[in-house]
Design a protein with these regions (language model features):
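Short, conserved loop/helix-junction motifs that constitute active-site signature segments
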Residues: 155, 177, 216, 237-250, ...
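Rossmann-fold NAD(P) dinucleotide-binding segment
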Residues: 68, 76, 230-254
Length: 312
């Protein structure tokens, strides 16, 4: 029987068990047991990782362990016991560890979840459509479609700002760039944004002081907000600040935190008044789960059941 779970601290209010069990409630494991998901809470990363090694087939990883988990798999890879390929190698943080025949593999479904959520914002219904048409290859096809459609939606390269450069922010930065957006990085310490830009010169990231946040929002097409707390400027925004630029598409605002959103009801009302699109943190959670659970189980999750679980 495979065992699955989540490490991080604090995680007691996580919705991940709800989503995982909804994703596979109509399916059984090879031994006939149901798919279950545990919260492996604790502030000690090494203890949590050891528990994974001893007892679990695959785990999700959340704050504050994403970069520590990546570093651990890097160490294992040097010994021939770890696997790092694809976007996670550029991001330098992982939210998903899976035991394989080649060792522990690190993945990043924050990256895939962001791409899926943004594509869904611009093309409502596309995720379900592509799952139906392409099954386990839906994400690759979705990403390809979005890149091909970009020039039809924007008359010049669209611009994104990533606010926060932790593990989720790094994934957001790579996702935005891989989707064709020129990408600005903002962090409370500019040096961290600069370090990420220097580490990934192929993306031509532009580090910008966080004091420029308000002006940058006016000028960009996509905002991905990953800080755990709200910047004071959010209260100061008017609806006009969220208005689209000229003939471009509506401005899209996405945030990571679903427990305590930084864009409160008032801010979201201003976004709506400007005909902008707000993607709440639970949609990010949904799509990172949708794209990540396949790595954990080898099975396609039930998207409709997951959506119903979130709404319930």
């Amino acid at each position: 029987m495979g065992r699955f779970g989540l490490i991080g601290d604090p995680i007691v209010t996580s919705k991940s068990p709800l989503l995982f069990e909804a994703a596979y409630k109509e399916q059984e494991q090879p031994d006939g047991s149901p798919y279950k998901y545990d919260l492996i809470e604790g502030a000690d990363f090494e203890a949590s990782f050891k528990k994974f090694e001893e007892e679990y087939s695959a785990i999700n990883v959340t704050a504050p362990f994403k970069e520590l988990a990546y570093a651990k798999v890097e160490e294992l890879a040097e010994l021939g016991k770890g696997v790092i390929t694809g976007p996670v190698a550029r991001i330098g943080a992982t939210n998903l560890l899976v035991k394989t025949s080649e060792g522990i593999a690190a993945h990043n479904s924050d990256f895939t979840g962001i791409v899926a959520a943004i594509a869904e914002a611009y093309y409502p219904g596309i995720v379900e459509e592509f799952i139906h048409e392409y099954a386990e290859r839906f994400f690759i096809k979705l990403h390809q479609f979005f890149l091909m459609s970009l020039s039809r939606r924007f008359y010049q390269q669209p611009q994104a700002i990533i606010v926060g450069c932790g593990g989720a922010g790094r994934a957001a930065a790579v996702a935005a760039a891989e989707m064709g957006f020129g990408t600005v990085l903002m962090n409370r310490t500019l040096e961290k944004a600069q370090a990420i830009a220097q580490a990934m010169p192929e993306y031509e990231f532009f580090p910008d002081p966080i004091k420029d946040f308000k002006e940058a929002v006016k000028e960009c097409d996509l905002i991905i907000y990953t800080l755990p707390v709200a910047l004071p400027e959010i209260e100061e925004f008017s609806a006009d600040d969220f208005a689209k630029k000229g003939a471009c598409d509506e401005k899209v605002i996405m945030e990571a935190n679903y427990k305590n959103p930084s864009f409160d009801e008032i801010a979201r009302a201003k976004i709506a008044a400007a005909e902008g699109i707000y993607i709440p943190g639970d949609r990010w959670l949904l799509y990172q789960a949708l794209t990540g659970y396949h790595f954990m189980t080898g099975l396609t999750p039930d998207l409709k059941a997951m959506e119903a679980a979130l709404l319930g």
